[in-house]
Amino acid sequence: MEQKIAHQLNWYYYGMMVLALVAMVAMYLLVSKGTIAVIDTMSTAGKVIQYIVIFDALITIPLGLYGFKRVCDKIRSMENEELKFSLYRRYAAIRIVMVSNAMLLGIITFYWLGCYRSMLWVAAIAAISWYFTKPTARKIQIELAPKQDNEETY
C-alpha cells in the first residue's frame, strides 16, 4: 500500500517540478520579449510583491512541513488502515503543493522583478524544503508507524 501511495504522490511531486520549469521558461520568454513589463524593485509595487512572496514563503514552508508532522501524529493512531492511508495521501499532496507554492512564486517574481536575486534565494530555499517532501514507501512507513518512546524516526 505504501508503494502505491508513494507512486501516486510522485505525480504531485514531479508535477510541481515540471510546473516550476514551465514557469521559469514562460517568464523568461515573456520578460525577454517585452510582453510583461519588468517591475522596478524599488517601486512601491516591487516592494509589495517582494513582501508578499517572502511572507508566503515564511508561512507556507513551515506550515507545510510542521503542520503535516502534526497531522501525521493524529493519523498514526487511527485503526482503520484504508482511512489512514487515504488521509495520509490527501495531506501529503497538500504539503507538496504548499511548499512548492513558494518555489513557484519565487521563480515568477525573480523574472518579473528583473532578475532580482532575493527572489531567486526565496525560490532556492523553497526548493530545498520541497526536497524534504519527496514521497517514498519507506518514508510513509516511518511516518505512519506507531510512535515508540525514545525511538528515532529518521
Identify what each model region corresponds to.
Residues 21-32, 65:
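Alpha-helical transmembrane segments of multi-pass membrane proteins
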Residues 76-98:
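Short membrane-interface loop/juxtamembrane segments of multi-pass integral membrane proteins
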Residues 122-154:
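Alpha-helical transmembrane segments and their immediate juxtamembrane interface regions
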Residues 32-43:
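Membrane-interface helix termini and inter-helical loops of multi-pass transporters
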Residues 44-61:
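Alpha-helical transmembrane segments
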Residues 100-119:
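Alpha-helical transmembrane segments and their membrane-interface junctions
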Residues 62-84:
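Membrane-helix interface/capping segments
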Residues 1-22, 77-83, 142, 152:
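Cytosolic-side membrane-entry/anchor segment at the start of a transmembrane helix
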